Every structure is written in C-alpha cells, then in structure tokens.
Amino acid sequence: MLEVFFLGTGGIMPTRERNVPAIALRYKGEIILFDAGEGTIRQMNTAKLSPMKVDKIFITHFHGDHYLGIPALIQTMNLWDRQKPLHIYGPKYTFQFVQNLLNSGFFRPGFDIHVHELGETRLKFGDYEIWSFKVEHGIPALGYVFKEKDRRGKFLKEKLREYGLEEGPILGKLEREGKIEWNGRIIRLEDVTGPRRKGLKIVYTGDTEPCERVKLFSERADLLIHEATYLNPGDRGDSYHSTVEEACDTARRAKVKLLALFHRAFRYSYEDYVEEALKICESLGVRAVVPRDFDVITFKSGTWELRNLLEERE
C-alpha cells in the first residue's frame, strides 16, 4: 500500500483554504517529502504524520513556497531529540541554500544533515527508486519519479501442488533465494508464480511550463501530480507555469492512469477552478482529480481511492 498526502496544494502564497506545496508519500512506514513550503510542519501535525519518520526531503526548486518550511521541520526534529540523519535532495545550489537556512539563527541541529545536489539521476532505496529529471521553470528545477520495484507474481496453487510444495518456511526460502532443491528437483520461483506485478509509479513535476521531459518520465504512471497554475494561457503571462489544458495534454500523451492538478493560483476559488478544470480534462479524455489540502490518495491491490482527512474527523 502507498498513500499520497496533499499537505499543501496552492501556489505562490498560503491562503485561508490552502497552504503552499508539500506532498508526502507514506510507504512501508517511511514518509518521503516532496517540497516543504512554509507551514509544512503544521500541515503534517494536522495530518498526524510524524516528522521523525521523514528521512528524505526532495526539493524541486528554490522559490520560497517550495522550501521555506525546511527550517521549522529541522528544528522540530531536533526538539524531539532526533538521532538519525536527514537527507535533503535538490537541484544545483541546494547545498548553498541549506547552509544559509542553518546559519540564519542561533541554532545547530543535533543530528547529521546530508545534502545531495542532483542532475538527472536514479537513486535506489530498497524496494523503490527515485528518479530526478529537469523541468523548465527559468531557474534550476527538477521533477521526481517514485518507482516501486516490480513484485513477484502470486503463488499459483496448482503449481505448488504439482511440485509438492505447501505454504510455510520452504516458500519463504524460495522467495529469498529464487530457487530451491525439493524432492530431487530444482524449482525456480518463476515455476510456481504468475506474471510479475508492476510496481507503482508516481510522478511529481514541481513548477514547470510544458516540456517533453515531463511526458517522457511520466509514461504510464499510476499518478502524475502536475502543476496547473492557470486555467487559461491569458492568465499565465510570461511566467514559467502550466495551464490545466497543458497538464492534461501531457497526461494524455503519456498514457497516465490518473492526473492530479495542483499549485493553482490564489486568484481562483476551489469551486470555480475545479469545475472548469474537470471540464477541460473530460474533454481531453483524461481522468483527473483536483486535490484539496489534506486529501489522500491510497493505492492498494491495483486500485485507488481519494479521501479527505478533515472530513473523516467530522
């Protein structure tokens, strides 16, 4: 199971109804943060997500609405006596900006902070990988892919009977080692399992104008979280942002299963934006949602569901 928490869905500045960008992925007990705008620690507290379970923060770029929540996160971790290291990843200048943040007050964390400046790369972490790719925002900026490793197929009962195998430690050994000797025969894992199951693929663009690299890295993603700051090109002007139609076009061409539109400009109310945005997506044949703060998309057993944490508590 994987959960995607939309802690902040607005852009540029906070409003009464939405905070600035922060996306949290919860996977096998770990919380991975993508961007951390101001107020992210408060949003995490409201969502009941512990910052102590965050080992990695991936920053897309250094405009304030995407990174100014980092100092408060670090200080909170320190107050809670964090011991394990924190890893912060981002584009060129990440080391410089993190150093500036840590030097901005009378404060020194009691745990190690490791800073990683990335270009386009592929990072491996146990059961998943993070890919970084360049986007177009007028400054050094990255998008990210969370890619779960493919999983083995399900054990086939008829094949287990054929080879005289039963559930228990022997199947655990077969799964760990890939093959075993049993009753004088060599049995391979693929002999008794179905087709391998594709791991989940989640893509987060950060801020970007339309670019082909987003389409390339989003191919057949389960979820594409694409900025769609503006409803129409006339509102955009010369800014390096995308419209709803441009985000939908990318998702359609990449054959994305689900598109989440975020980072809408503060000029739009949620009601006005979502009505127009979903009309555009429907006209292009794209399945889409417009998350609010504290919406959660849960992926489990090949399906997904959307819920809102605050509504659940009413």
Swiss-Prot record:
EC numbers on record: 3.1.26.11
Residues holding Zn(2+) 1: H61, H63, H137, D207
Active site: D65 (proton acceptor)
Residues the entry annotates as binding Zn(2+) 2: D65, H66, D207, H263
Cofactor note (record): Binds 2 Zn(2+) ions.
Cofactor: Zn(2+)
Catalytic reactions on record: Endonucleolytic cleavage of RNA, removing extra 3' nucleotides from tRNA precursor, generating 3' termini of tRNAs. A 3'-hydroxy group is left at the tRNA terminus and a 5'-phosphoryl group is left at the trailer molecule
Alphabetic keyword roster: Endonuclease, Hydrolase, Metal-binding, Nuclease, tRNA processing, Zinc
Gene3D superfamilies reported in the protein's UniProt record: Ribonuclease Z/Hydroxyacylglutathione hydrolase-like (3.60.15.10)
EC main group: hydrolase
Superkingdom: Archaea
InterPro entries per record: Metallo-B-lactamas, RibonucZ/Hydroxyglut_hydro, RNase_Z/BN
A Pfam family: Lactamase_B_2
A molecular function GO annotation: 3'-tRNA processing endoribonuclease activity
Subunit structure: Homodimer.
Role, per record: Zinc phosphodiesterase, which displays some tRNA 3'-processing endonuclease activity. Probably involved in tRNA maturation, by removing a 3'-trailer from precursor tRNA.
Family statement: Belongs to the RNase Z family.
Protein name in UniProt: Ribonuclease Z
Organism of provenance: Thermococcus kodakarensis (strain ATCC BAA-918 / JCM 12380 / KOD1) (Pyrococcus kodakaraensis (strain KOD1))
Gene: rnz
